[in-house]
Regions:
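Active-site helix of classical SDR
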Residues: 152-155
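Structural signature of the Rossmann-like NAD(P)-dependent dehydrogenase/reductase core
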Residues: 5-6, 82, 120-123, 131, ...
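C-terminal substrate-binding subdomain of Rossmann-fold SDR/epimerase-dehydratase oxidoreductases
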Residues: 200-201, 205-315
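NAD(P)H-binding glycine-rich loop region in Rossmannoid oxidoreductase-like domains
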Residues: 57-101
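NAD(P)-dependent short-chain dehydrogenase/reductase
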Residues: 135, 158-212, 217-228, 259-261
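Conserved Rossmann-fold NAD(P)-dependent oxidoreductase catalytic core, especially the SDR/UDP-sugar
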Residues: 80-82, 86, 107-148
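N-terminal Rossmann-fold cofactor-binding loop
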Residues: 30-35, 63
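N-terminal Rossmann NAD(P)H-binding glycine-rich loop of SDR-like oxidoreductase domains
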Residues: 3-23
């Protein structure tokens, strides 16, 4: 398949590209002009080989001008993965104007995907769309986002699906839960724990009593590939285009933190209750991943402890 991917150097984008290249696909990796993170794509063996073989194409283009992609990508493409989204950190999630701009650009990206001949459009939504819940979250669970970020992602789910139907494309909306692994953002909980515990430092945390779920980045990348490769007939009649993408291990967040602490040989310490919650507040993550497993055959393979060990080894 010929696949276009925005947010190509992001944590999720880079992992998805590596997975797709390793499985023989051709990728147009859309990056910001003068991006300083190209090494995330070209530094891996899969990227180096694909560049030599002409299966990896680096396309410089601003997220706000997706219409220009038709001038930079020659020929027809099969699918489009839109991982590009400005301001995903906790602080930027409350910025309504930025999130409105993200939504507008994303809808224009759908139109660009159609112009490129794509038949399938994957969008990276977020668990932040669900808001506060105390019970298991299925794709049918009512959404009540608590930030401008979650609200914009939810609006894209509705408007993006409608636009894709109008243009004759299959819309697939990934609700991604907490991903971790090599290349993760330095401000995430897992990375903060690893920094503190390997550096023998104290880490300020919330109460960490809520239920949580993590997915290792390679498993997430495989889920993206599964949703791209699954035949169209498998999606017929499902109605709701949302797919939860998460791990299969849900437990109190504190247990995950303590497991990281043990794997870091007990260095440093945890100051529970010392930190205020993020933009969405203290949410419970209890995802149901039955739908994606049933329709695509994908399932998470990496146990949390195994993923932490791999992340430590990559440092």
């Amino acid at each position: 398949m010929r696949i276009v991917i925005t947010g190509a150097t992001s944590f999720v984008g880079a992992a998805a590209i590596q997975e797709l290249l390793e499985n023989g696909h051709e990728v147009y990796a859309v990056v910001r002009p003068s991006s300083r993170k190209l090494e995330t794509l070209t530094g891996q063996e899969a990227g180096k080989n694909a560049l030599r073989e002409g299966r990896l194409h680096i396309v410089e283009n601003d997220l706000s001008a997706p219409e220009l992609l038709t001038e930079k990508i020659q020929g027809s493409c099969d699918a489009f993965c839109h991982f590009g989204w400005g301001g995903s950190g906790s602080g930027a999630r409350t910025g309504e104007q930025l999130q409105e701009e993200n939504l507008r650009a994303s809808l224009n990206t759908v139109r660009a995907a159609k112009a490129l001949g794509c038949r399938r459009f994957l969008f990276s939504g977020s668990q932040a769309e669900y808001g506060m819940h105390q019970t298991r979250m299925t794709e049918e669970t009512e959404c009540a986002p608590r930030s401008a970020y979650g609200e914009a992602k939810l609006r894209m789910r509705r408007q993006g699906e409608a636009l894709c139907k109008e243009l004759g494309m299959r819309y697939i909306h990934l609700r991604i839960f907490s991903a971790y692994g090599p290349g993760d953002h330095p401000w995430t909980l897992v990375e903060s724990c690893l920094d503190a515990f390997t550096g023998n430092a104290a880490l300020s945390l919330g109460a960490c009593t809520q239920k949580w779920n993590f997915i290792y980045i390679t498993d997430l990348a495989k889920a993206v590939r599964a949703l791209l490769e699954t035949p169209e007939t498998a999606f017929e009649g499902i109605g709701n285009p949302v797919f939860n993408v998460a791990g299969d291990d849900t437990r109190p967040l504190k247990e995950f933190v303590e497991e990281i602490h043990r794997l870091c040989k007990g260095g440093g310490s945890c100051l529970y209750g010392d930190r205020k919650e993020n933009a969405e507040g203290a949410v419970n993550l209890i995802p149901d991943i039955g739908k994606i497993c049933r329709i695509t055959g994908w399932k998470p393979e990496t146990a949390f402890g195994e993923g932490i060990k791999k992340t430590l080894e990559s440092r």
